[in-house]
Amino acid sequence: MKKIAIIGAGISGLFIANLFRDNQDYQVTIYEKNTSIDLDEGYGIQLSTNSIKLLNKIGFNTLENKDKFHPDKIDFYTVKPEKKICDLNISDFNSFDCKYTTLKRSKLVEFLKDRLEDNIIKYDHDIEKIEKDNNQIIITFNKSIKVICDHLIISDGVFSKGKSIISNNEIKPVYNNSIAIRGNISRKNLNSLNEKNISLFMGSNFHYVIYPTNNDNEASNFIGVLKYKLTANELDNYILKLQ
């Protein structure tokens, strides 16, 4: 039996572990630096039909309809003045069992996590070193914990410590002078927006998108991207917090 170590218990790490769940040829363990997985409500996520096709292989189609939403179109607007430009009918790309989907990120993480045995995820494991000895990989975590595996999958996010270790810090994210703002907006404050669609507003220095994340009458998800230049000190502090 081959041992697979997955670094990071985010969406990608949990999804990969689910793919190997019933394969008796592999023993999969996820190593997560945090002490638990955050299942707070959080923000929304959009999944293309290709994503849904992959997720359905591990039972995503069994998720209750009330916990997800299938938008009909993307409505494009200008920010100033607020005026609709056009729309794109994304439902044209849907099939019976693969539909463009929006939902809360926490709901997707919960679905992926609940399909795995509790002992698959090892918390409070912060990767520090990766070494190779013949055909085996030796991983050193905090508290001098060592793990030996046959295959290593690194999926610990954009500010990946695992990738930095492998590349000797040669791989670093590039800041493009933009920041993301996330939140929720009450549906009663959406004025004339079509609640069945994704609304995308485009401005010179600020784009934002609003969309529902389930079929309940809850607040819609909001995410905006704003042009904003962080100082070198602010950027260093931000990266350190995420590592």
Model-predicted regions and their roles:
Residues K196-A232:
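Active-site substrate-recognition segment that forms the wall
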Residues R21-E41:
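Glycine-rich FAD pyrophosphate-binding loop
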Residues M1-S12:
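Beta1/beta-strand and adjacent pyrophosphate-binding region of the FAD-binding site
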